[in-house]
Amino acid sequence: MGSPAAVVAGWGAAPAKRARREGSPEGPRGPTAESDRCDPRLWDTERLCQHLSCCGVGEPSLLRRFRESGVTGSMLLDLPACALEVTRVCLPAERLKVLACLNKLRQQHVDVMKVFNDPIHGHIEIHPLLVRIIDTPQFQRLRYIKQLGGTYFVFPGASHNRFEHSIGVGYLAGCLVRALKERQPELDITQRDILCVEIAGLCHDLGHGPFSHMFDGRFIPLTRPDLKWKHETASVEMFEHLIASNKLEEVMKSYGLVLEEDMNFIKEQIGGPIDETACEKSWPYRGRQKEKSFLYEIVANKRNGIDVDKWDYFARDCHHLGIQNNFDYKRLLKFTRVCEVKNQKHLCTRDKEVGNLYDMFHTRNCLHRRAYQHKIGNIIEIMITEAFQKADKFFKIEGSGGKLYQISTAMEDMEAYTKLTDNIYLEILHSSCPELKEARDILHKIERRQLYKFLGETQPETMRQIVKNNSLAESIANSKPEKDPPDVELKAEDFIIDVINMDYGMKEQNPIDKVLFYCKADPSKAVKISKEQVSKLLPMTFAEQVIRVYCKSQDPDTISAAKQYFIQWCIEKDFTKPQDGDVVAPHLTPMKKSWNNMRDDEHRTAAEPSCKQRLPFDK
């Protein structure tokens, strides 16, 4: 019998208006009586026996054995377990008929899956339990948090949000784990495993704050410098709050999940081991045993950074930024398998894909240089951070029990944090509260494009690490040039210093050194491939620092003076020469010898005669 057409649900519509078929879960209170009747996964033993009778396999002795065994509809999710139970309960002559009946029932109910039309992955099927999670205030909150934060102020197409990215990651997580199940049945990947991995992918970004990484990367370190907080921690807390406040525990059980064990597994995929001291143990996780260690490398791969989260944001961000994406995750899906190394199972990639993986990390680096760390996008985020910092004491958010929280403390209460989105930008901008005037003025400058002026960027010439702190602005204010000094006196508060760490995802390490490969000759054996085995044209270093300096003033004379301060500061600190150094401060750059030494190849080129002079027949 052919399967009924699935529902196509658009993301643009409000979740309450999404088209639903009869039998799909309705509302936040759990399955209705109608969905109990139509969705076989929610059937109890008696309802299952009634269906067997309708199929013509309702002999009293068979039904009695089914009732005694306690088989329920949730077992239909896991075909191997279902077949095992049928083999145990049924007589040999009955087994084929019963299995055929139950399998047909499974096939008839693919309409329970919802279909979303995603601009990146096309028409994708989403499990009804994931739809129940999506249709909650905690998940819908992600519609109002920009994926790329302040980058949207520079790239007009980068208007996408954490909402669609999270759905994409949930989908890709399911694609990868299903591909592994089909390719390697011996891994014993169950339907429970698949569902938990999909939920972890879907919920991995629930904890992001306003403007995504601006909140945890700039605002929180500035307002609460002693707090060691990560958005992954908030994602775990928000996931717990989502399940509890929407009473989804019973729904999870109805789809075959074992609540405590699978909740732990989902949270561990998002935030790592629940017990931090457990990291010292040989196996720190509670949700799954060591035999399924590879499942922890799908959503957030702590070992080498190759995970479905990156696969989605590479494709999605490039699409919206208008930047070419040279990495195709679909090819990697076909060449990923599991191998055992030192008593643990890890995701491995075919050896011939090593070049594509270098391309993947190169794509990541290019995205950071061209978009994520754009000099204008960054200064806009710095200005928004300043505005939020000035508004922090006066902006109140109501949490559980009526308690009020600030912007910087809202993540302590998930009810308050649910209300904290990019919308606070507009609330401050359009407020009439006198206490918010300073914050409002900064946001008005952003709206009028009266941004802090970019003076230039530089890098440390040696391998030393520059730590971002207030002393950097003080040192640049003390670097007034002695040769032809400008008339303007500048102070530390006139400067903004932004220190950016660029890398391939693992600081100074080569992430490919952490990747395991397999060869065609023996797909079960994992090997490593060194950089030297791939190409001599690959990067020699995998991390660098970029130091950008801005001036808060809009006055042309002040900006001109600030650029000279900046050049003098680079000379004193032994940093590289800014690209426009010879233009903005031609009287200063000759003072540093290393800035004016041409390389040997430049000397040779200057010394060689031109082609016209060398050719004897050209007279």
Name each region found by the language model.
Residues 2-38, 67, 103-199, 207-458, ...:
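Sequence-structural signature of the catalytic-core scaffold of metal-dependent phosphohydrolases
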Residues 2-21, 25, 32, 371, ...:
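Terminal helices and disordered tails flanking the catalytic cores of nucleotide-processing hydrolases
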Residues 27-58, 63-64, 73-112:
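Sterile Alpha Motif
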Residues 73-75, 84-86, 94, 321, ...:
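Eukaryotic short linear interaction motifs
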